[in-house]
Regions:
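Soluble cytosolic regulatory domains appended to membrane proteins
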Residues: 6-194
Length: 194
């Protein structure tokens, strides 16, 4: 490499074409090519394109008891929940279940003051790469997406952003966690999948 040589600029389109060509020749596998393509789309994608819609979000309500919150947490198995007051558009904060269970036995007022943290609000037009950088810097991996009127469109997590780059993570994790199924056929015989 000649350090005095002029740098050759390569466009996004040329890199995409090289990745496709490498994939067709078998030099780059399909998953690697998909990640390269997703990387270039990442900065063009608004967060509302992949946010979990407000109708699909499990919420905690300020007028519920801690017992109701615990039941909701056990039934839905998420790690962070928006806490709303009166309407879904009035998010007063977010609750991480680690904090909720760490303060088990405390009053609801204590939980609201010490465990429910301020929500990170973002406009629906924010690009995925901007939110990714913001979450990385702030270490806040949960954002409430708002429409132009301040109403909640949905939520986006760091996991959602990563899935835009590398594909669905939950299915991959679920496959790893699945144990081979087995069934007993007779006293000395078992059928084991896998």
């Amino acid at each position: 490499i000649d350090p005095n040589a002029e740098a050759v600029e390569v466009s996004e389109e040329e890199i995409r074409k090289m990745a496709d060509a490498g994939s067709k020749k078998g030099v780059i596998d399909l998953e690697e090519n998909e990640i390269i393509q997703n990387l270039f789309e990442f900065d063009d994608m608004a967060v509302d394109e992949f946010a979990t819609h407000r109708t699909d979000i499990t919420l905690l309500w300020t007028d519920e008891t801690l017992q109701q919150w615990e039941e909701t947490i056990h039934d839905s198995r998420h790690t962070v929940y928006p806490v709303c007051e009166e309407t879904v558009d009035h998010v007063v904060g977010v609750l991480n279940i680690k904090d909720f269970f760490r303060f088990r036995g405390r009053t609801k007022d204590f939980i609201m003051k010490h465990a429910v943290k301020p929500a990170q609000f973002i406009p629906k037009s924010v690009k995925a790469d901007v939110l990714f950088r913001r979450m990385k810097v702030s270490h806040n991996h949960f954002a409430v997406v708002l429409d132009e009127y301040g109403g909640m469109v949905g939520i986006v997590t760091m996991n959602d952003l990563l899935e835009q780059l590398v594909g669905d993570l939950e299915d991959d994790l679920a496959e790893l966690a699945e144990e081979p199924k087995s069934s007993r056929i007779s006293k000395d015989t078992w059928k084991i999948d896998g």
